[in-house]
Each structure stands twice: as C-alpha cells, then as structure tokens.
Amino acid sequence: MGRCSGRCTLVGICCLQLAAALQRQIFDFLGYQWAPILANFLHIMVVILGILGTLHYRSRYLILYSIWLALWVAWNAFIICFYLEVGHFSQHRDLIMNFNTSMHRSWWMENGPGCLVTPVRGPPLPLADHHMVTVTGCLLDYPYIEALSSALQIFLALFGFVYACYVSKVFMDEEDSFDFIGSYDSYGYQAPMKTSHLQLQPLYKPG
C-alpha cells in the first residue's frame, strides 16, 4: 500500500512538473529565451522518463530523474540570482538568455500584470540598445515573475527528488528480494537421480 501511494504521489508530482514546464516553455518561446527553452525541453523529456520509470518499475530511470532534478534545482537557483541581479549577472543578461541573437528579453517585461508600454520617440536607436519601449505601471516587475516561476520549479523538484529516491529504493529492495528467493530455490533444488537402464536378473546355476 505504501509503495502504491508513493508511486501515485510521484506520478502526480511529475504531472505538475510537466504542466509548469510547458507553461514556462510557452512564455520563453514568446520571449525568445533560447537558453531556458533548451533547459525546459530537457526537463520535459526527463520528467516523462521519470513517469515511465514509475509506472514500469524502472529504478534506473528514477535514479536518472533524481540526478537531473538536482541539476534542475541548480539551474533555477541560477535564474533567480540572474533576474534579481545578484552579483554581475545583469551585465550579460542578453548574452546568457537569448545568446545575443535578438532584441527580446522576458515576455513578462512588456506583458506583465498592469504594465503600460509606451514606444520610444526620437532618433533611431542603435541596434545594441534594446530599450525600444518604456514600461510603466506594472503591478509586479518581470524579474520577480521569473524568480517566482523558478521558485515554483525548485519547490516541485525538491518534492520529486524525495519521492523518486523513496520509490527507487523500494523498487531496488524488491529486486534484491526476488534475486534472493531465486538463489534460495536454486540451492534447494535437487536434480533427479538417473536410473540405470541395466536390469539385474537372477543367475541360476545348473544342478
């Protein structure tokens, strides 16, 4: 019963991770954030692998899923520090997130709740200047929205990591018990004795 509840909980967590990752992938596509797009794609693939491992009793899949979740937590912690400008990440924002291939930033920069976008009037701006509009009136600035999204990913990943370790341990314990039972049966098995095809007959001595 405990194993079943653990498996069901892990599948539920994986489904929540898929939903959150797909939602994030859509907004990253809209903002042309290529580095997060690649990371989200890998995350979706590994989460699907974790679901398959849970449903088909594959402990190795769950171990791989657990390792990826540790990397995923580190990546999202980096994104939180990045958007909250911890250290010198803000100096290379465009280069890191979109590989410096476009003039876009986060989709939430211009489409956040309550944001009012005003085009910049005046002489043409150089291509290196990405500030083509002014954004005012946002109820929540886009760095905080991105940080909250990453915090949600970390929250789900931590729960997934704990349950994946638990379920994979249950699977490995069951595999070990099956191997032990199989080896015990092999020792207890006795091969049938071969019967001789020679037939003994009484020898009569002539009188």
From Swiss-Prot:
Belongs to the NKAIN family. It comes from Xenopus tropicalis. Keywords: Cell membrane, Glycoprotein, Membrane, Transmembrane, Transmembrane helix. It is found in: Cell membrane. It is a multi-pass membrane protein. The chain crosses the membrane at residues 2-22, 35-55, 62-82, 147-167. This is Sodium/potassium-transporting ATPase subunit beta-1-interacting protein 1. The lineage of its organism: Eukaryota, Metazoa, Chordata, Craniata, Vertebrata. Glycans are attached at N100. GO terms for cellular component: plasma membrane. The gene is nkain1. Interacts with atp1b1 C-terminus. Its main location: membrane.
